[in-house]
Amino acid sequence: RLLLERYSTSSTGHYHPNYNKHKVHLCRYADDFIITADCKEVLEDVKQVVEEFMKERGLKLSEEKTATTNINDGFDFLGWNFRKFEGKLLIQPSTKSKKKITKKLSQTVRYYRESKQELLIVKLNQITKGWAEYHHCVCAKSTFALIDHRLWEMLWKWAKRRHPQKCNKWVKNRYWHPKCGRQWSFRTDTIVLYQMMDMPIVRVKSLYLNKNPFLNSDYFIKRKKEHEMKRKLAYQKSTAARSEYYVL
């Protein structure tokens, strides 16, 4: 409201988003937030306003997390990287997020290096499915393929370590089996390793900015149902669903 009153007020004293000539907008999630504007000078002024507002309440901005950047250079927020490329906004998993998931998968494979294949797959599926679910609405297809490949490399080392005296063909046939046209399916008779590439990318419909989740619950419930239906239809059309890859 503070920013709305300062940057979206008309000459008569009324404030409305249409009066926002400098395009100052706030997007917040928990204690993380971003503020956008049409130029750096306005953002510097906004920063002072925010600092004064927080100081009165005994708070202050984190110096290491606070930065002013151009949208063409990009910035990270909530695990995603936002950047404009040739006039088009691209939202992708951030580099930090990719490093974090890679490290977590590596630690999991290492921790279960002596465990049965079934248990390892269960633990990995919990990680990969959750991460793919979170990033399903952004440009993440190439990232999914990259993480899948890195995980394959980890699992190959895991398998070779367990059988150092066996040849590559024996190791491959022991842990990877053909299924639905895929020759390298890391699976057993009871469970299949989930591949992120099988997660359909489904964009989230833009919000009506005049809607409030506490006052317009029907709108948000309907919006959520529509998105879930789109995801369901997208998966039904996917190769994994049509070939019943995950059906045992």
Language-model regions: role of each:
Residues 1-248:
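Non-catalytic terminal/accessory segments
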